[in-house]
């Protein structure tokens, strides 16, 4: 699958140019729309008929700032592991193949949340998330009320849980720019840091993991602050079903990217790539 053809390649191999009518009998499917109902609203349909050029999707991610601040001090790693994110740390930084992700999006069906491949249907499962990243897939869901708070209120919460209050310019509504978290890590952890300071540093790393990697969005550089209160008690953070939240984010990102009008995609795409590459 890593070297698979996209639909624009299929047109080329068949000698069909973008401005050439599709030969009779050649149909992109589906023939029956009882289940597969997206029709013309799917990226694959638009590429097949030459309505879009089939350019690669822009893969948005913002986790480099996190990996640039590794290895992480052992005293901080202990709390990250306690929160259930040790497997993500062990996976390390991985490049994302934009062509592979784009080809997979062309084969993704929002109606069934599966990839339609020549060999049949396939998808990413909770078991994949658990095995590859060690994220918890049982327990309470990652949900909550997105309560509006002023910048001053969020600043006080950041001071308590992260050990610093970001400048006003780093806030974007109820989101925080990831750059300020990475800059906070530029100052090394003192050798005599207290237990509370180690916990605060661990929360900074976890927010970078969530906003830049596991639950990233197309902003490419912001994390919703609604995650921060969930990180207050690191002993209970690992009980949440972060694996379910991660998989739901991936599904939503794939469904959104099938829209022909979309040019970018975000989410835990490294997971998708790792799962897909063995299928060749």
Protein language model features and the residues they cover:
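N-terminal leader regions that mediate targeting or early regulatory function
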Residues: 1-251, 267
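Hydrophobic/basic alpha-helical segments enriched in Actinobacteria
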Residues: 129, 255-258
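Short, well-ordered loop/turn and helix-capping segments at boundaries between secondary-structure elements
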Residues: 135-138, 256, 277
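Flexible helix-coil junctions and inter-repeat linker/turn elements that act as hinges
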Residues: 215-219, 259, 280
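A glycine-rich phosphate-binding loop feature that marks nucleotide/adenosyl-phosphate handling sites
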Residues: 268-274
